């Protein structure tokens, strides 16, 4: 290229145009035949004056050099074509060696050194964790109070408003079990630790810092692992989930309280329930990283944020699992499906009251909007319908369970149509609006419903 620029600088315009025409023709397949003038190939060009004799030899040398460059490029291209299949094959091998080889290996996987820190939503009763003391909550004097916080992205601010108003009313219970999915996974540790962290949640969901999470990769994202960069989400979680938070979660776990987070194993297509208190109380040096990785995975919308790779082992072989948004499997983490499906295996209440509080960070009612007949709007609209129906089914299952067992059912959801755009997913005005909605409805006494209401 340097040679090209130097030579062109030494040529008069007429000769440069002739050479460029020759190069353009060769590059794009329009090569003049011997004796054919450039204007015969490119008839729209003006007649060019003949080049002067003084620069003829330089132009000839330049043409020879350019032809050599073209031959080099052609040879390099052919070499790449020959090598590409081998490169792709090697790349494929590198990507699959450290992953589960089949469903059997994936289902038998565990996190080395941690014991029973996870189970599956679809686990059979005989597959339930054997260490019951580390999983079952210890009932308090007033029975068991369980808080379940759903997914919903920016709608998580609704939960924050509810919790803030609940604390202000001084009626917020000390929850024995807290579960979180997706954005609910980010809220759950603070809801678990109590009202002292309301201001932290307020800052996280209404200050505008959530808008930093939207950093695109540009066109590259369409062919990579995600549209948005993972860095901002990971950095935010590392900033708010500190060693001090881990120690406090561990202390509450030792008191018999339980914190559960849901992720989705994309390879096995199974919803994974993580015992976050057991992880925090493990004493392992990598416990904080695993804790943060699980929260990141649960909040990572597939395709929007990259999945999180978590190290596991099965039968002595070590590999990585790909975990992503828990909301892909369920918008709300409730009881194992085996309990919900069979009344003959319901755990005894032993005379203790059980309260299920479910906060849905989304609207359950239909929301009318004219959908543009374009690819992305149609996909997004269909996805929102899927989320609604999935949540409605989960709530119906839990409600039926409470009717069989005598437990009490309480559900809160966004029941007003707040303007929202999926092209501006963490809009601060939207987050503040749903925060205020949750707060105001709690104060007004209209928040909780004793059965699912979908219209």
Predicted feature residues:
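C-terminal motif of bacterial Sec signal peptides marking the signal peptidase cleavage site
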Residues: 89-92
């Amino acid at each position: 290229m340097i040679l090209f620029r130097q030579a062109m600088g030494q040529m008069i315009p007429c000769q440069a145009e002739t050479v460029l025409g020759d190069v353009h023709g060769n590059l794009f397949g329009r090569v003049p035949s011997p004796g054919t003038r450039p204007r015969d190939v490119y008839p729209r060009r003006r007649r060019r004056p003949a080049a002067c004799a003084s620069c003829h030899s330089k132009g000839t040398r330049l043409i020879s050099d350019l032809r050599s460059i073209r031959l080099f490029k052609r040879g390099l291209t052919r070499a790449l074509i020959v090598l590409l299949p081998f490169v792709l094959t090697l790349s494929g091998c590198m990507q699959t060696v450290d992953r589960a080889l089949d469903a059997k290996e994936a289902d038998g996987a565990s996190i080395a050194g941690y014991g029973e820190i996870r189970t599956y939503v679809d686990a059979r009763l005989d597959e339930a964790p054997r260490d019951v003391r580390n999983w079952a909550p210890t009932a308090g004097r007033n029975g068991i109070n369980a808080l379940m916080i759903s997914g919903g992205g920016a709608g998580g601010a609704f939960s924050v408003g509810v919790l803030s108003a609940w604390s202000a009313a001084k009626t917020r219970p000390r929850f024995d079990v807290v579960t979180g999915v997706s954005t609910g996974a980010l809220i759950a540790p603070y809801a678990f630790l109590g009202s002292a962290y309301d201001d932290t949640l307020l800052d996280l969901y209404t200050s505008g810092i959530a808008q930093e999470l939207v950093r695109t990769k540009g066109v590259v994202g369409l062919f990579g692992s995600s549209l948005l960069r993972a860095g901002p989400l990971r950095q935010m979680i590392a900033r708010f989930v500190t060693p001090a938070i881990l120690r406090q979660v561990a202390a509450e776990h030792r008191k018999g309280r339980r914190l559960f987070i849901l992720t989705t194993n994309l390879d096995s297509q199974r919803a994974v329930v993580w015992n976050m208190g057991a992880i925090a109380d493990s004493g392992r040096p990598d416990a904080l990283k695993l804790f943060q990785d699980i929260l990141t995975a649960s909040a990572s919308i597939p395709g929007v944020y990259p999945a999180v790779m978590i190290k596991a082992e099965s039968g002595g072989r070590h590999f990585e699992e790909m975990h992503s948004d828990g909301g892909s499997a369920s918008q709300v983490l409730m009881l194992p499906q085996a309990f919900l499906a069979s009344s003959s295996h319901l755990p005894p209440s032993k005379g203790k009251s059980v309260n299920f509080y479910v906060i849905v960070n989304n609207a359950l009612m239909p929301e009318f909007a004219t959908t543009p007949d374009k690819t992305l709007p149609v996909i997004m609209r269909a996805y929102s319908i899927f989320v609604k129906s999935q949540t409605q089914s989960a709530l119906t299952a839990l409600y039926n369970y409470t009717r069989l067992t005598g437990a009490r059912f309480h559900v809160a959801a966004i029941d007003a149509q707040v303007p929202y755009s999926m092209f501006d997913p963490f809009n601060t005005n939207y987050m503040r609006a749903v925060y205020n909605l949750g707060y105001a409805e709690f104060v007004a006494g209209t928040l909780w419903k004793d059965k699912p209401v979908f219209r």
